[in-house]
């Protein structure tokens, strides 16, 4: 409904601007803290026409027409402010409650491939890069709600030297002494084998040679070697998928790096790049001179023995991917910026007209306690999730002595996982983040538990009384109108967040929505109100429940009914 309000404000504004004698296309309409819709157009016109912006604003408002959704329009200084009418409130509540897909935009026909996480299959996911699946999955949920035809991909790096090291390690377990993981998850077992084999590789040239031979055999698709690689990588992926599923992160397709070697795509790309004017060779290795693209270092494509590198195979993957979508989006750590510049240059040399859109993120750090990342120790994401759930359990147990133990554990799991997801996604991806327990598990205002609690409160009210026929005109308190307006804004928020690829925007909105509901709840008793008013407020509680559930859903957080 807010999109309709913007449309109405734009229609009135365009006519008034023309009637006032100005010629402008962009009306500069935005949401505002001081009004329902605001325009700063007078500032822009004042700069162009060398006139007083306040006088321009007054002249435009004087010509303003009428709309059933707009109660009044005011010139406040140089701003033009629009205020929604009661009919807008009434119609918004009706549409929120009656429209099953109110929180989804119409399909736009744009095919998007979103790739995220794509961690090396060498062990468990760790906290530093734990931001990737959370950002990626939130973007996926936003893009789907935004009407995009989306496929979420995980690119499986199954051909690197790290993977060859693990294959060698499993073949020579009698020569290495892997540590014993404190869990049955296969990715934790894999990393112990990898560490032990790596230590031996560094100290024994013969081992290094054997690992190189294994990698070479795999690149040339030796059947027996290929089976070993696939088994090892799938085993590690199994453990990583368990972690991701626990965080409500899922994928449509796992794309294997080796497939692009097997089907000749890598050789085809290398051949074409080798024939380009940018190709150079040194000691048998093929590289690209990218100085004309503003990069000093050469981009190495193959080793001296002719085997390809990860970056080469990544080029073939992107050629394949770009041919299958209108837009490709990658979620990557900020340390990959140079690699992506080189990739885009190579794609340009190959004649690609499109390039992937990259959402870069800064890494997550843990500042205190036994899980501190400042000590240079890699902290597994599994450990962070376990810690979050245990801390959440303490809070739940403190508040709910009346419920069974199993129920407490279920709530703690939902609250703990939600706390991690929300605290990581609430900050813009490009900004660094320090994970703090006191913020993440804040039941009062800052964290996901605050939003989950608002949803649970809605469910508790609705369990006692179901909404029936209602008269929305009974909702006259400012907090009631503010809550309806906040709910009605969600499609607008989805549109902006999905278009601009800003997952933190929906997190901020969800928290503001929970706050708006709490403000309403504080001033507007529901169950003890007079019958007609009670029905109207119950309808608003149901609308709030739907909106809170939808916003939590887009954040990948469980909308629990009891806390």
From Swiss-Prot:
Keyword annotations from UniProtKB, A to Z: Aminoacyl-tRNA synthetase, ATP-binding, Cytoplasm, Ligase, Nucleotide-binding, Protein biosynthesis
Family annotation (InterPro entries): Arg-tRNA-ligase (IPR001278), Arg-tRNA-synth_N (IPR005148), Arg-tRNA-synth_N_sf (IPR036695), ArgRS_core (IPR035684), DALR_anticod-bd (IPR008909), Rossmann-like_a/b/a_fold (IPR014729), tRNAsynth_Ia_anticodon-bd (IPR009080)
ATP-binding is among the record's keywords: yes
Reactions the enzyme catalyzes: tRNA(Arg) + L-arginine + ATP = L-arginyl-tRNA(Arg) + AMP + diphosphate
Swiss-Prot/TrEMBL GO biological process terms: arginyl-tRNA aminoacylation
GO cellular component: cytoplasm
Principal location listed in the UniProt entry: cytoplasm
MF-aspect GO terms: arginine-tRNA ligase activity; ATP binding
Top EC group: ligase
Name used for this protein in its record: Arginine--tRNA ligase
Gene: argS
């Amino acid at each position: 409904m807010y999109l309709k309000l913007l449309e109405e404000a734009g229609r009135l504004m365009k006519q008034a601007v023309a009637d006032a004698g100005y010629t402008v296309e962009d009306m500069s309409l935005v949401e505002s803290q001081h009004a329902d819709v605001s325009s700063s157009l007078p500032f822009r016109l004042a700069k162009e026409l060398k006139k007083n912006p306040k006088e321009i604003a007054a002249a435009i408002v004087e010509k303003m027409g009428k709309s059933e959704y707009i109660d009044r329009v005011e010139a406040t200084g140089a701003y033009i402010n629009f205020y929604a009418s009661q009919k807008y409130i009434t119609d918004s509540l009706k549409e929120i409650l009656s429209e099953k897909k109110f929180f989804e935009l119409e399909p736009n026909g744009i095919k998007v491939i979103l790739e995220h996480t794509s961690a090396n299959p060498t062990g468990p996911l760790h906290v530093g890069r734990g931001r990737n699946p959370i950002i990626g999955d939130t973007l996926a949920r936003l893009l789907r709600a935004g009407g995009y035809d989306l496929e979420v991909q995980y690119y499986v790096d199954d051909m690197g030297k790290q993977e060859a090291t693990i294959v060698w390690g499993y073949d020579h377990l009698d020569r290495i002494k892997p540590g014993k993981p404190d869990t049955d998850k296969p990715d934790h077992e894999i990393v112990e084998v990898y560490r032990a084999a790596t230590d031996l590789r560094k100290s024994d040239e013969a081992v290094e040679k054997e690992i190189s031979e294994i990698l070479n055999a795999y690149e040339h698709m030796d059947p027996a070697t290929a089976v070993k690689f696939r088994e090892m990588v799938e085993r590690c992926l199994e453990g990583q998928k368990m972690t991701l599923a626990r965080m409500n992160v899922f994928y449509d397709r796992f794309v294997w790096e080796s497939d692009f070697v097997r089907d000749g795509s890598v050789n085809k790309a290398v051949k074409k790049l080798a024939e380009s004017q940018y190709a150079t060779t040194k000691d048998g290795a093929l590289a690209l001179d990218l100085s004309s693209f503003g990069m000093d270092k050469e981009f190495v494509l193959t080793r001296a023995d002719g085997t390809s590198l990860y970056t080469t195979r990544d080029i073939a993957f992107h050629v394949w991917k770009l041919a299958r979508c209108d837009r490709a989006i990658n979620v990557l750590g900020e340390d990959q910026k140079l690699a992506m510049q080189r990739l885009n240059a190579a794609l340009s040399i190959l004649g690609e007209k499109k390039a992937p859109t990259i959402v870069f993120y800064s890494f997550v750090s843990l500042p205190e306690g036994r899980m501190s990342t400042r000590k240079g120790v890699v902290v597994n994401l599994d450990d962070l999730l376990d810690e979050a759930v245990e801390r959440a359990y303490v809070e739940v147990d403190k508040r709910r002595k009346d419920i069974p133990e199993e129920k407490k554990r279920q709530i703690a799991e939902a609250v703990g996982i939600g706390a991690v997801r929300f605290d990581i996604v609430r900050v813009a991806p490009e900004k660094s983040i320090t994970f703090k327990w006191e913020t993440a598990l804040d039941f009062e205002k800052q964290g996901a538990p605050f939003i989950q609690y608002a949803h649970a409160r809605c469910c508790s009210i609705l369990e006692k009384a179901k909404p029936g026929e209602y008269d929305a005109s009974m909702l006259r308190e400012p907090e009631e109108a503010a809550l309806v307006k906040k709910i009605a804004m969600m499609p607008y928020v989805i549109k902006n967040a999905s278009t601009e690829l800003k997952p933190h925007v929906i997190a901020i909105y969800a928290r503001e929505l929970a706050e708006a509901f709490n403000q309403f709840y504080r001033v507007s008793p529901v169950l003890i109100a007079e019958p007609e008013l009670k029905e109207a407020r119950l309808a608003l509680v149901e609308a709030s429940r739907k909106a809170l559930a939808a916003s939590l859903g887009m954040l990948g957080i469980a909308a629990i009914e009891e806390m």
